[in-house]
């Protein structure tokens, strides 16, 4: 079956799950993460078929995969993201995308859909990236005096390391070069990470643009939530579904299987039990009562 039609068949089901998740979640503005993933062993060299690369939307507050679009390679994410955003109701949400998706047309599409964005900046954004970095570095020299900046700091310990993150959000200066590139641009920001691993210290700075107004905790939450698609969704697909090991090489079948993997993960994530996703999959095989409750998002 055509992958787009196949996903459309799940629309009502997914809407029902999303409504239930919204009732359980107290987030006023849910964060939707957009990111790509390569299905590493889905290539077929004999027939000159490259590995499948997919782009999906993960609602981190709801633990739901809301849609997926396949591309031939990672470089095609720029064209896949607009198509994906058209498939999903993103109204009132905060959309987070890495630097590849920081494009004028994508920012406009998000704002036109009555959503907000937090988009990563890297060197490929040229003038805008350089202007944001320069403005923030100059502001750091004066400890952000007179910039209207707001800060929020978090500390985490685990996996043999200590990490302190400082989130800084600033209003967009009127003279910022390249500011007209992105519709609705209101704030810029940086996350400065200081990491201590066994006495070895390192630091990192990541820059962002956003249509959000000032509110540094909301800004920080959106950035932190973006990692959920990698740490929760993609990790489970690789470790539990073994997606990277799949040798399905038929175009339509591998796309539809990719969506089924994401949808079944979403179903299991709705169960409030403390067991791992792998154990919940086993419960579906062992316990018919559990199995019949999972599809409606009411597993107990």
Can you name each region flagged by the protein language model?
Residues 1-97, 102-105, 274, 286:
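Conserved, well-structured functional cores that handle cations and Mg-NTP chemistry
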Residues 3, 86, 115, 137, ...:
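Generic secondary-structure signature for well-ordered alpha-helical cores
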Residues 4, 8, 12, 179-188, ...:
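Charged, often Cys/His-bearing segments associated with DNA-binding zinc-finger transcription factors
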Residues 35, 117, 230:
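Residue-level signature of catalytic and energy-coupling elements of molecular machines
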Residues 107-115:
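Short, surface-exposed basic-aromatic patches at helix termini and helix-loop junctions that form
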Residues 118, 122-225:
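An anionic, glycine-rich sequence signature occurring as long contiguous blocks
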Residues 145, 236-300:
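A short, flexible helix-boundary coil/loop motif
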Residues 209, 213-248:
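Short amphipathic alpha-helical "interface-anchor" segments enriched in bulky aromatics
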